[in-house]
Amino acid sequence: MELTGVTSQSIFDDNAADIKLSWVAGLEGADRAFDVEFAREATSAADLVGHLNLIHPNRIQVLGKPEITYYQRLDDETRKRQMGELILLEPPFLVVADGMEPPPDLELRCTRSSTPLFTTPVSSAAVIDHLRLYLSRISAPRVTMHGVFLDILGMGVLIMGESGLGKSELGLELISRGHGLVADDAVDFVRLGPDFIEGRCPPLLQNLLEVRGLGLLDIKTIFGETAVRRKMKMKLVVQLVRRNDGEFERLPLDSQYLDVLGLPIHMVKIQVAAGRNLAVLVEAAVRNTILRLRGIDTLRDFMDRQRAAMQADAVSRGQGRLL
């Protein structure tokens, strides 16, 4: 996992309000970060944060009530040895959760070694879950793509195509039909799971749609709060193509996909031509995709019916020749 620029200070700033963190010791370790090699070998955020564990001292260590109770039962010599092993490998920071008071000797050792020590009244399990989700999000693969990203019938749809094909005009038409805008022109996508890509709008372009001849439109102001979305899961790509595009298949037998961050996203191509109602076609493509996700494939069903009809016709002809 790539965690460039992630420090104890940045993690504290981003999460202090949500999980009620207080910084009680080791202020000089604000620039403390994950070991580069350790972070690179981590396969998920679960490797980067967890309950007190001396086998994995490089990760964020969370001490709840059971860990503090265990620590207090140790004799002085064992405490010094175990905490020495932990502090020596410079974990990003320690968190004392469950509203527990950090033991004085632990606080003193963190101060002397410039190891950040946080406290929180939140349960240790909740702290771990929150930090794992946070680290997963900031370390997830991401990409910015050109197009219009919309919420159509509850599905995240990216409309792509060459410049001048009318992507923004199509987006405006779909918004006027009750669908929602996520982003126009530049869409930030991040892969948050094995089969989950989320799309958002860059802050600079929030709620804006550019239409040739009209300029920038504030969709939230014009159509209301319900016409915009903060984020959506990407489920479908609609590729607009010119009418003379030689690669266009009228009836594609195999499903088409676009690779986005290593995940295949279902794609449909729609030809742009005078008189075609693209908004209706996009809505139909979305409805058809919803059916496909439910296991209903209209083209395959038709091909099966056609095959059965041809076989029945062949059988009847064979019987006719026998007679």
From Swiss-Prot:
Gene3D superfamilies (alphabetical): HprK N-terminal domain-like, P-loop containing nucleotide triphosphate hydrolases
Entry keyword set: ATP-binding, Kinase, Magnesium, Metal-binding, Multifunctional enzyme, Nucleotide-binding, Serine/threonine-protein kinase, Transferase
Active site feature: 146, 167, 185 (proton acceptor), 250
The UniProt record lists the keyword tRNA processing: no
CC cofactor: Mg(2+)
Catalytic reaction equation(s): [HPr protein]-L-serine + ATP = [HPr protein]-O-phospho-L-serine + ADP + H(+); [HPr protein]-O-phospho-L-serine + phosphate + H(+) = [HPr protein]-L-serine + diphosphate
A Pfam family hit: Hpr_kinase_C
Record-linked SUPFAM superfamilies: HprK N-terminal domain-like, PEP carboxykinase-like
Renumbered residue ranges of the record's region Important for the catalytic mechanism of both phosphorylation and dephosphorylation: 209-218
CDD domains, per the entry: HprK_C
Binding-site residues, ATP: 161-168
Residues holding Mg(2+): 168, 210
Family per similarity comment: Belongs to the HPrK/P family.
Note: Both phosphorylation and phosphorolysis are carried out by the same active site and suggest a common mechanism for both reactions.
Function: Catalyzes the ATP- as well as the pyrophosphate-dependent phosphorylation of a specific serine residue in HPr, a phosphocarrier protein of the phosphoenolpyruvate-dependent sugar phosphotransferase system (PTS). HprK/P also catalyzes the pyrophosphate-producing, inorganic phosphate-dependent dephosphorylation (phosphorolysis) of seryl-phosphorylated HPr (P-Ser-HPr).
Protein name: HPr kinase/phosphorylase
Gene assigned in the entry: hprK
